[in-house]
Amino acid sequence: MGDSDDEYDRRRRDKFRRERSDYDRSREREDRRRDDWNDRRPSAREWDRGRERRSRGEYRDYDRGRRERFSPPRHDMSPQQKRMRRDWDDHGGDPYHGGYDLGYGGGGGPSYAPPQPWGHPDMHLMQPHHGIPIQARLGNIHDMDLGPPPPVMKTFKEFLISLDDSVDETESVKRYNEYKIDFRRQQMQDFFLAHKDEEWFRSKYHPDEAGRRKAEAHSALQNRLGVYMYLMDNNWFESVSLDIERAPQITKILDAAVIKMEGGAENDLRILEQPSEEEEERERLSSGGTPSEPSKRDEPKPADTENKPSEEKDKMEEGEESAEKDGEKASAGGSEGEEKTEKEAPAEPIPEPKKLSKKRKRKHSGDSEDEASASESESDSDSDSNSHCSEKPSEREREPEEVEEKEEEEEEEGEAADGKEQTDEQTEREKEKEKKVKDDQPPRPRPLHRTCSLFMRSIAPTISKAEIVALCRRYPGFMRVCLSEPQPERRFFRRCWVTFDRGVNIKEICWNLQNIRLRDCELAPGVNRDLARRVRNVNGITQHKQVLRNDIKLAAKLIHALDDREKLWSQKPREETPTLELPAQNPILKNITDYLIEEVSAEEEELLGSAGGGDSEDGSKEGNPTEITVERDEKLVKVLDRLLFYLRIVHSIDYYNTCEYPSEDEMPNRCGIIHVRGPIPPNRITLREVSDWQKTFEEKMGPLFSVKENLSEDEAAKMGRKDPEQEVEKFVVANTQELGKDKWLCPLSGKKFKGPEFVRKHILNKHGDKIEEVKKEVVFFNNFLMDAKRPCIPEMKPPPHPGPGQGVLSPGGLPFPPQGPQGLMGFGQPRPPLMGYGGGPPYPPNQYGGGRGNYDNFRGQGGYPGKPRNSRVMRGDPRNIIEYRDLDAPDDVDFF
């Protein structure tokens, strides 16, 4: 189908449009833009076609004031290429150009990168969108209400511009330091006011809620300590070492600890001796499939049903009971919906016997009706044959027969009633016996160490934990909710785990929660998978005797620091703790110094001769480390493993992974992962490898030793620490209003007084709750201020302008612009990830108040990724740079 005449004329007019002056006709073209040609052509080939024209005039609209130099191309080397349509002029509705026309400082421009030549144009939308507004998902970033951008601290150069010329250098430095302190103080106060009503912030710094949270954490720690002492007293750690070969035994110990933490008894620990759920499923499927076949084979024929109705009923009742038991087992042991369908599959043919029984009952009743009709017909025939007899004798004969039949029926009914009474008594006796047997048997162990859980990626900071608990408590098997620490780079959104009992249908619960919103925040839950590898290994060099001794020293030091911080052994134990008597010092640290002292045979070496030892020492000093074999000391291994189990179970610290698992008591798996020693290296190791391992490991362990840092008094005063008495005085003055001469008002109660001193006395006496709130608010703010690691908005630093040589891609380098920092939109709006090659850069940093969108920044970073090196836009300066190059030379860089 050809284009219309108007379209053909327009194309003829535009044929030589490049030779016209952009400066003269730029405004006319703004009014006479092309139609949206994206609808007329396949979108999948849009960027491929545009790739050919990127080498010359793609960025012309970003500098409309300039005039380009056009010269006729040379055709002796290659034929003339067809000039493509400029379908990128109209940016309406295009997410890449949506924020281009924003004013200076208006929203920071679009966040998406320019079109990548290797990806689909819609690929930028393929990203997790949990918690991101719908405008961001549709590409209209400039329509999002992200609030005002946070202020950016001025550089010293920018600050000097605002100063008078008469200010000398020392004074300017002094004023700039004051400006920085004022800026940080104001930023901190704004952050406090913005987040002080959010649950995560109050639970961290508010005096009431922080104290409650600390008490809960301490009680949970005491519970964990009691579990560890129970396991140690019952010799659970005796025959187990933290080696990767003992992974099943290590997992069993962790599961036993979880069962005890959940309040399990001795009987519940027996479930660890039973086969796992997978083995039970196989056995259940095999046992469920075999009995179903004989039941089908042994189905009685219709002729037999008349003879054996009672036996068939008994069989049917037994089958229904077994089906119910199988269904209960399946519901108790299943974890996922797919598994449940497999488990319930053997129970599907069960309704068929019910239908058969109904048909058989109908058949029985039909047979009785046929018999009755047959007897009636027989009686009719008899009456017809005996019609010659008189009617009176027949009536006389019928009367005694009817009386006899009634008597027989009454006798049968009495016998049936007696039989029913006897059967009822028997069933009651059987039930009582079964109850006694059940009471005598121990209760079935519960799988307290296995759970099902849902994961919610983005929970808004305004949503409290109580709201999620109230929402999920409606579903059976609900246990607990865990919310992670807020992520400043993601607008302080939190991740959430909701834990349920193992016997629930977790996929059904997940489906029911799919479309539920809390305060305009989509929960978007997903089923959380079980942990794949709970026991993971590190380098086998950790089995060396020297490394083991160093690990004992570090672990003992860490245990001592954590116990002192949490005051586990210094105070008297509470009544509710499982361990009634706790010694003043941790028993596992007793005589620990005996294993930290290294024993050497120096005298023996001296007597036998120091030649060999001297040579080895000289060799090590010269930088030629000697190779040694890994020596394992079982005594050191046993002592170290006891310490590492203590760290993992009590303090939730994975020693070999050098990390702490926060909020583990609220997570679905309370003792999920542990890292252990790997197999012994097959080759010999060097002393340098041992020393390097110890050095790097100690550096990684450093953050675990660090105590909570607080600001000094001087720094706190500079940052604006508040005094409770002064704040109370300000509160009283603010609530003392003068209405007129000798008329003063207390706005809190509406009462009037003759003087301000009476209002003050009234507030202090009658509004003590308000005064306490003011004091708590002061403590709240000071707690936040004194935290040296307090949360804050991520500081946005402008990227450094590239030098003249940084914009040009070298032939030997990567065909990508330099790596830019992962910037944020608005208040921590997450940046979409790059959907291209793995080695490519992220999208360019989006600055607050970014002028004409984000393209000027990107031009300063080397143009589009994969753009040929003859591009003219690899600079940050908007002015043209005159360059001299051979126009006939082919492009020497072809990335695709």
UniProtKB/Swiss-Prot annotation:
Listed Basic and acidic residues bias regions: 8-77, 294-329, 337-355, 389-399, 417-443
Entry annotated with the keyword Transport: no
Keywords: Activator, Cytoplasm, Nucleus, RNA-mediated gene silencing, Transcription, Transcription regulation
InterPro entries noted in UniProt: Nucleotide-bd_a/b_plait_sf, SE/Ars2, SERRATE/Ars2_C, SERRATE/Ars2_N
One BP term from GO: primary miRNA processing
Region of interest (Disordered), residue spans: 1-92, 268-450, 607-628, 850-877
Keyword Glycoprotein: no
A cellular component term, taken from the record's GO annotations: nucleoplasm
Protein's job: Acts as a mediator between the cap-binding complex (CBC) and the primary microRNAs (miRNAs) processing machinery during cell proliferation. Contributes to the stability and delivery of capped primary miRNA transcripts to the primary miRNA processing complex, thereby playing a role in RNA-mediated gene silencing (RNAi) by miRNAs. Independently of its activity on miRNAs, necessary and sufficient to promote neural stem cell self-renewal. Does so by directly binding SOX2 promoter and positively regulating its transcription.
Family assignment from sequence similarity: Belongs to the ARS2 family.
Protein name in UniProt: Serrate RNA effector molecule homolog
Organism: Danio rerio (Zebrafish)
